[in-house]
Amino acid sequence: MKFEKYIDHTLLKPESTRTQIDQIIDEAKAYNFKSVCVNPTHVKYAAERLADSEVLVCTVIGFPLGASTTATKVFETEDAIQNGADEIDMVINIGALKDGRFDDVQQDIEAVVKAAEGHTVKVIIETVLLDHDEIVKASELTKAAGADFVKTSTGFAGGGATAEDVKLMKDTVGADVEVKASGGVRNLEDFNKMVEAGATRIGASAGVQIMQGLEADSDY
């Protein structure tokens, strides 16, 4: 099992500089991570720097609130792909979910999935803002909309992934949709908990620390 391929090496801070983007790109290339996940403004640069590697470029759409219009999310998606994005992590309309406007939530996801045709789409449901039933419903809508992954968190809402939420999401979507855990995965112990709960992708700024922990662990 190639654990490095579980990791989306992530830098989404608004103050991220080109120097910091260079650092995570260099680290991702060194460890052969699945992707680097950066804000849309950095996608074109990252794609150019990663053109000679297997590392993919992931970006975020409707981030971090999910409260932009569907048309805006579609434009962001098309623009990101034109700039070289391989994977799209979008945020759902959280307020619509809480209102019970499930058709609106699903159509929002479907529009991004259509705009990103041929590219992986991960749907951020922001678990820290949801109760048990809302996590289940958001996961069901993600699956119904044809997305590839359901993802826990933006990291901007005061909480991140928990193993319990990851398991609930995985139990809900089954084998057809994967689960990405993000937010607060800082070391090998956190990583292992998420993978054991059913995550097959981990969004983390601590990818290097996780891999160093794996290298130091005689079980791997």
From Swiss-Prot:
GO CC annotations on file: cytoplasm
Places the protein is found: Cytoplasm
Active site positions: 89, 151, 180
GO terms under biological process: 2-deoxyribose 1-phosphate catabolic process; carbohydrate catabolic process; deoxyribonucleotide catabolic process
Pfam families with a match to the protein in the record: DeoC (PF01791)
Listed EC numbers: 4.1.2.4
Pathway connected to this protein: Carbohydrate degradation; 2-deoxy-D-ribose 1-phosphate degradation; D-glyceraldehyde 3-phosphate and acetaldehyde from 2-deoxy-alpha-D-ribose 1-phosphate: step 2/2
CDD domains according to UniProt: DeoC
Cited Gene3D superfamilies: Aldolase class I
Top-level lineage group: Bacteria
Keywords: Cytoplasm, Lyase, Schiff base
Enzyme class of the recorded protein, top EC level: lyase
Molecular function per GO: deoxyribose-phosphate aldolase activity
Catalytic activity line of the entry: 2-deoxy-D-ribose 5-phosphate = D-glyceraldehyde 3-phosphate + acetaldehyde
Alphabetized InterPro entries for the sequence: Aldolase_TIM, DeoC, DeoC/FbaB/LacD_aldolase, DeoC_typeI
Record function comment: Catalyzes a reversible aldol reaction between acetaldehyde and D-glyceraldehyde 3-phosphate to generate 2-deoxy-D-ribose 5-phosphate.
PANTHER family for the chain: DEOXYRIBOSE-PHOSPHATE ALDOLASE (PTHR10889:SF1)
Protein family membership: Belongs to the DeoC/FbaB aldolase family. DeoC type 1 subfamily.
Record's protein name: Deoxyribose-phosphate aldolase 1
Lineage, top ranks: Bacteria, Bacillati, Bacillota, Bacilli, Bacillales
